[in-house]
Amino acid sequence: MSRGGFAIGGRRFRFAGTNNYYLHYKNHHMADSVLTDASLIGLRVVRCWGFLDGAPADGTVLQPAPFSYDEDGFEPLDHAVFRAGQLGLRLVIVLTNNWPDFGGIPQYATWFSAEHDDFFRRRDIKNCYRSWVRHVIGRRNRYTGMRYCSDPAIMTWELANEPRCPSDTSGDTLVAWADEMSRYVKELAPRQLVAVGDEGFYGRAHEPCYPYSDHDGVVWQRLIALPAVDYGTFHLYPQQWGDMLPEWGIRWIHDHIRDARAVRKPAVLEEFGWRADEATRDAIYRAWTDAVERFDGDGDHFWLLTGRNADDTQYSDYDGLRVIYPSTTATLLAGHAGRMCPSVGHFGHGSAGSHPR
């Protein structure tokens, strides 16, 4: 489209979505609960983890050692992709983590006796990551019979969750890595989208406001300009980033949508959260989602939708950001979802033209 947004069948596609970090290792009941609730709320896209490195979680591991992959471990992820397709949901699958949860870059550093930022520089570590990416994207789902790279339920591959390289505040190291890996992913999955998965930090020297500063070696405008990166991602956590007021988030949303439009690419607020009582949080989420709508943003994912355990109790609120269905927050987000994408139906496996472009 002329403004650089998502499109399906020639029509613009905007969405409201969510995150969930346990679809790839929890049981079917728990995964189905999350995905069904997402569909009931009217969400279109779910962002989930597609990695589990080193130590198992609940007995499941995907990459127990470098270049070693556990086929049995992929069963929950296969099921989640299959079930998402049945429900007409699209998935954003993240390929590694900046943080130690489920292994991620810290696990690669341990494996290779390296420092965190060596992940973005050393060829041996890059080769390990590339091998992992090739294995995941090319694998055949036991439930659908399709390779992941051909599955319309998978909308996007993300290089990493919140990658940071603070040892190079210029941003050159992270940009070079993202350029190499986004091109590689695009070769493996040419009909699916590619995003970096970063937080949207601006990388400005001498900027006193942390998310706009160069502290973590992330330069968002350079990342979204990369030719194989299809859209820009940004996160929003004012409490964690410097105890800023909720109103600060309106500026953050505006700036990213504006700057993505300048390079004719979509911008997605793919994580946002605020810890507070439900009424206070609802007011803040209403202001932020209204801003996405008002500034003509392309999509957003709140952090995070959880479902029910095997015994039908609610999943624990480990980080204080849990959203459950039904709730007043879910009702608020359902209204936002309806305004973002009021007329796009569900897209099951094999739907023609179902990949956003």
Can you annotate each of these PLM segments?
Residues 1-258, 262-266, 276-329, 335-336, ...:
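Active-site mouth of glycoside hydrolases
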Residues 269-271:
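Glycine-rich anion-binding loop/nest that anchors nucleotide
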Residues 331-357:
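Terminal, non-catalytic domain-edge segments
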